[in-house]
C-alpha cells in the first residue's frame, strides 16, 4: 500500500529574504533573520521606503502665521 503525504502550508517553501536573498525562516518571515528584519525597519524609519499618496496642494492648508502668537 502506498501512503499519501499531505502537504501543509508549513511545507511550502518561503520566498527569499527581501534584504539578502537567503531563504526566509518561519520565525522571522519574510526575513531570514532578526538582523535583516532590523535592517528593513531601519530603512522604513529612515524614510528610505515610502508609500506614495495623493499630491497635496499647498493651498489646502490653513494660512500659517509666524508672528509668535498662539491662538488659544
Curated annotation (Swiss-Prot):
Residues 52-72 are annotated as: Disordered. Keywords: Metal-binding, Zinc. Gene3D superfamilies: Erythroid Transcription Factor GATA-1, subunit A (3.30.50.10). InterPro entries: DNA_gyrase_inhibitor_YacG, Znf_NHR/GATA. Its cofactor is Zn(2+). Interacts with GyrB. Inhibits all the catalytic activities of DNA gyrase by preventing its interaction with DNA. Acts by binding directly to the C-terminal domain of GyrB, which probably disrupts DNA binding by the gyrase. HAMAP family: DNA_gyrase_inhibitor_YacG. This is DNA gyrase inhibitor YacG. It comes from Methylorubrum extorquens (strain CM4 / NCIMB 13688) (Methylobacterium extorquens).
Amino acid at each position: 500500500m502506498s501512503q499519501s503525504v499531505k502537504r501543509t502550508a508549513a511545507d511550502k517553501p518561503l520566498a527569499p529574504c527581501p534584504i539578502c536573498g537567503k531563504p526566509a525562516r518561519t520565525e522571522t518571515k519574510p526575513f531570514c533573520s532578526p538582523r535583516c528584519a532590523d535592517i528593513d525597519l531601519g530603512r522604513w524609519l529612515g524614510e528610505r521606503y515610502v508609500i506614495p499618496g495623493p499630491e497635496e496642494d499647498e493651498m489646502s492648508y490653513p494660512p500659517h502665521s509666524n508672528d509668535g502668537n498662539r491662538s488659544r
